[in-house]
Amino acid sequence: MQTAGKLRKREYQAILGAIIAGAIILAVKPEVLLEGIQRSSLYAVIALPMALILGIVGIINLAHGDFMMLGSYLAYWFAVKSGLDPLLAIIPAMLAFFLIGILTFYSIIKPVLGSPELNQLLLTFGLGLVLEEAANLSFTSAPLKLSVPYVSASLTIGELTFGTFEFVYVLAAILVFYIISLFLKNTRIGRAARAVGQNPKGAKLVGIDINKTYLIIFSLSIAIVGAIGVIFAMRHSVFPVMGAPYTMKSFCLIAMAGIGNITGILWYSALLGVSESIITAIPGAAGWADLVFFALIVGTILIRSYQQRVK
């Protein structure tokens, strides 16, 4: 796993692209740049836990966004039943989802470790469908919306008006990135996890308990994405299939950044989030935002493949 440190060549390309896009819209519509930063942070904070699982456990978790969806439903249930601010559900959500991660690992993930990748993909895809259907049966497919007055607050500076709650995503992305980086660099379990991610057989030979490491990393990642679901529910509608698009975008960001490169995820999130904001700011073009997102990903992968062939 690459943490905060030296940048790769591909990251410089992403940074350059984000800077160019940011400079253009800053000169024309600065509020679009702020929206792009907020959108980028949301993508990054969702993708980082998925990258941790893929980089160390080696599993592509196609149910990733569905765990976030469950976290959002937990926030809704907590707020409705208690009458308290749903933000207070973050710590209970992390604890609950850490336990859910343990249960999921032992019952579903561990039995397929070392199996063909297609089997793992089908299993996590099926798990996502089960979680979506469980949410549908429990809450119906109708979108649910929390009423939290302060999430719609805005700030005006001169002629620039922008929402303030979305900067929670920025703070969350920075916090999650540095927590993961410090955990991997400065803790015994984190260093063991990096060793397992780089060479599982070698790590086992030096006495590292691989299954225990997988368990901790998987459960920690599920706890993080469950807490993100709580924050997400405060601003967005909650419904059973809300997490699926974020699973795909997270996986695509990981593919662009490279497996194990959590620093690159931040930069590519910035590039894609800002690009999406530019598209949505164009009258009548909002529906093209996802198309542009995936077109940029395809273009990046094609260019990288061409560069590798040339070398």
Tell me the role of every PLM-derived stretch.
Residues 30-79, 104-115, 119, 257-262, ...:
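Single transmembrane alpha-helix segments in multi-pass membrane proteins
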Residues 42-50, 63-81, 92, 100, ...:
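Hydrophobic alpha-helical segments within and immediately flanking transmembrane helices
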Residues 1-22, 138, 198-212, 279, ...:
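Cytosolic-side transmembrane-helix boundaries in multi-pass membrane proteins
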Residues 83-127, 134, 267-272:
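Alpha-helical transmembrane segments within multi-pass membrane transporters and channels
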Residues 112-186, 213-216, 281, 285, ...:
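Transmembrane helix-bundle core of multi-pass membrane transporters
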Residues 27-39, 180-184, 214-257, 277-291:
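Inter-helical junctions in multi-pass inner-membrane proteins, predominant
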Residues 1-47, 74, 85-89, 115-120, ...:
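Membrane-interfacial amphipathic/re-entrant helices at transmembrane-helix boundaries
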